[in-house]
Amino acid sequence: MKKAIIFLLSFYSCVGFAEPQQARSDYSIEESQAKVNKILHTTSLYRNGLSYNERVAEISSRFLGTPYQAHTLIGSSSMQERLVTNPSTVDCFTFLDYVRSMAHASSWQTYVSELVKTRYTNGMIDFTGRKHFFTDWAVISPRNAQDVTQDISPYTITVNKQLNQKNKKQEYVKGLGIISRRISYIPASAIDKEVINKLQ
C-alpha cells in the first residue's frame, strides 16, 4: 500500500538514523551523482517487475549505514535557497526526499527534477516554499503522500496544531510564519498488531 509505506518510511527514517555519526562536509556533486546513478542502475535491473512500494524498499535499503547529519540544506529567510543533493549524509527529511525522488526517477536528470518537485511547493526552489514539515507532503501541491492515519485505526485522534509557533510572538524557523493545521495521530496505547500489519 503506497500510502502506508510513506507513513512507515517517516517513522523508520527518524528512528533508524537517530545516532549521529561523523559526516563528511566536502561531498561533491560528482560523488552525489555517482551514488544516485549507482542506486538507480541497481534498482533499474528490477524496475519492470517491481511495484512502487518495492522500489521504495529497495532504494531505502541502499541507505543502510548512511551517516546522520542535520542541517545539510542551504537557505533561510536571509539566505538564498540552493538545491542540495547529498545522499552521503541524511536526516529524517532528506532521507525521505532522496528515496521518493529516486523511486520516481530513471536517470540523474529525472532524479534532480523529482527532487525539486518533492522538496518544494510547485517546484520552485525557495526557502519559504520548501516543505519544512512532513504533513506538508499530504497538504501542499504537488502532494507526495496521503495521510492515511484515520484509515488504519478507529482510535485516531485529531488535534489543531500551530506549526512553527514557539510562543505567541516567536517562530521556531524565522520567516515561515505560523501554520494552523489539523494533525491526526494514533495513541501509543492503540497501536497493536492489526495496526502494524496495515503498514506492511
Language-model region placement:
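N-terminal signal peptide c-region/cleavage motif recognized by signal peptidases
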Residues: 13-18
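Acidic/His-rich structured neighborhood in mature extracellular/periplasmic domains
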Residues: 63-200
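Sec-dependent N-terminal signal peptides
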Residues: 4-12
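Functionally constrained cores in energy, signaling, and assembly domains
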Residues: 12, 51, 100-103
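Cationic-aromatic interfacial patches
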Residues: 21-94
